[in-house]
Amino acid sequence: MRLFIAINLPEKTKNVIEEAVNKIKPLFDNYSAHFSPKNNWHLTITFLGYQPPEALDSILKSIKETAAQFTHVKIDFESISYGPPGKPARMVWLTGVKKTSEKLNELKIKLDETLIENGIKFKQDNRRFNAHLTLVRFPDPLGKLPDKLITPLSLSFEAETLDLMESHLKQTGAEYEVLSEFDFH
């Protein structure tokens, strides 16, 4: 199973983002751009990669323990821009404010520690967490892109659950399935 742990967005929030994405779509008419489907939008906290079925109980236990330690996980977004920062643009992101990145970094550190304590093996990403939602992917690094894309989009929601997700890779793109949800307290 190809697994990751994420925060999913409420439908109301996705609808607001969808309106903003529809406004920027024409900018990319002459580019090979893949727009992420609305039903795939989420904030990945930890990517676990391929995990054997026998690891599932320990993964679920880790997520439950971690979610129970966090309350009021408020997610604030500030703009749509190219990503990743400081590198050639390969994506268009909805970026989180610094405070959101800091809070989610704290969540990620605790989650990763708990997974390791419970015997889960995965490739750790020790970079500082940068809260973002991938809206568009470019298959290859592109040369000239439409003028610098920074579109303010102030948007907030209260995350209610930390979710175990499975990624199904298909020729039409990845499809994500929620396997379990754990409430923040």
Annotate the PLM regions.
Residues M1-H185:
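Histidine-dependent nucleotide/RNA phosphoesterase domain, centered on the 2H-phosphoesterase fold
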